[in-house]
């Protein structure tokens, strides 16, 4: 008859304690680098956002009359039904022109340190003015926008309520502030990763935890950290090795166009990775459709590493855990134009 050996109590306890310690260490490491998405944003630059501003901004966000053609709205390129982006390489603008860069998601953009791939807008209010005036995008002017909105009594009343202290309520600046107020509501809390950061260890599965560890240990989190896992700082694309010209077109020098500083050539804002599984294609060029390919390219270009296939798969699984609760948006009824509203133009 075989005799059985009993595992010493200390060894038994240690065998249970080791995985728990490893789990705690992973959570502690992640908590030092990342923060969960807040449930809502109630103020901008220390000022409370009013309901009147949000509701006005929502209508303006969806109103194509802000464009010269009356065809394009903010939602055209930042579609709230498709992850806050438009899922094409570069957006189609006025007269079927194609923009030079992929449209970033509007979801959680309020948490970015600056807007656009090159950071040329300091906040969402400043960002809102850019596409409207860009001849490739909405091809309008501040004067035309003010004339359009001022010709619609319902908008005039809404601007007065949203900006009661303004000497000129219907203005291009206030339009941008209202859009910013609405866009600040477009946040996606309670992703599996958010729940994990808040203490729910079971919110991530085993593969996603492996991916999180690989993401941090490989160096991805050096650029992609904070609330948005990116969007906070600028880095050269091709820090170690330049990617193919299709991914990094030579004609787009990134932040150099803003600063005119040679060291900023091919420097871009680190892409926020929240909801990244929903916002293909990837990179400012919009030339990479598969998340696994984007991860492999970043390993080569930024880290100088040929990531192992298992690491790529695990990181992709982790990135899927960044998809949060999508905003439930009811399309607004827009006020009718009047006889004095400027007509669409080519």
Curated annotation (Swiss-Prot):
Transmembrane segments: none annotated. It catalyses: 2 Fe(II)-[cytochrome c] + H2O2 + 2 H(+) = 2 Fe(III)-[cytochrome c] + 2 H2O. Its main location: periplasm. Heme c 2 binds at residues 220, 223-224, 298. One of its GO terms (cellular component) is periplasmic space. Heme c 1 binds at residues 74, 77-78, 284. GO terms for molecular function: cytochrome-c peroxidase activity; electron transfer activity; heme binding; metal ion binding. PROSITE patterns: CYTC. This is Cytochrome c551 peroxidase. It comes from Pseudomonas aeruginosa (strain ATCC 15692 / DSM 22644 / CIP 104116 / JCM 14847 / LMG 12228 / 1C / PRS 101 / PAO1). The lineage of its organism: Bacteria, Pseudomonadati, Pseudomonadota, Gammaproteobacteria, Pseudomonadales.
């Amino acid at each position: 008859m075989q005799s059985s050996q009993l595992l010493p109590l200390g060894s038994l306890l240690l065998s249970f304690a080791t995985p728990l310690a490893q789990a705690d260490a992973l959570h502690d490491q992640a908590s030092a680098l990342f923060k969960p998405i807040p449930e809502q944003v109630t103020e901008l630059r220390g000022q409370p956002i009013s309901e009147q501003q949000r509701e006005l901004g929502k209508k303006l966000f969806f109103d194509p009359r802000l464009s010269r053609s009356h065809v394009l709205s903010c939602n055209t390129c930042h579609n709230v039904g498709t992850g806050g982006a438009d899922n094409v390489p570069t957006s189609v603008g006025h007269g079927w022109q194609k923009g030079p860069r992929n449209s970033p998601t509007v979801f959680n953009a309020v948490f970015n340190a600056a807007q656009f791939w090159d950071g040329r807008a300091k906040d969402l209010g400043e960002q809102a003015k850019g596409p409207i005036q860009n001849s490739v995008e909405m091809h309008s002017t501040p004067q035309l926008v003010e004339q359009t909105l001022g010709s619609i009594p319902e908008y005039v009343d809404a601007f007065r309520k949203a900006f009661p202290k303004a000497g000129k309520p219907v203005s291009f600046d206030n339009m941008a502030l209202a859009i910013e107020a609405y866009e600040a509501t477009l946040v996606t809390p309670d992703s599996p990763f958010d729940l994990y950061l808040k203490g729910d260890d079971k919110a991530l599965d085993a593969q996603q935890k492996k991916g999180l560890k690989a993401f941090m240990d490989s160096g991805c989190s050096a650029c992609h950290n904070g609330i948005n896992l990116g969007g906070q700082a600028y880095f050269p694309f091709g820090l170690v090795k330049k990617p193919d010209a299709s991914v990094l077109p030579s004609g787009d020098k990134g932040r150099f166009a803003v600063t005119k500083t040679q060291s900023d050539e091919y420097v871009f804002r680190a892409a926020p990775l929240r909801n990244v599984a929903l916002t293909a294609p990837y990179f400012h060029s919009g030339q990479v459709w598969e998340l696994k390919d984007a991860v492999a390219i970043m390993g080569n270009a930024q880290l100088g590493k040929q990531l192992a296939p298992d690491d790529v798969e695990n990181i992709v699984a982790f990135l899927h855990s960044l998809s949060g609760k999508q905003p439930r948006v009811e399309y607004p009824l827009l006020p009718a134009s009047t006889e004095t509203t400027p007509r669409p133009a080519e």
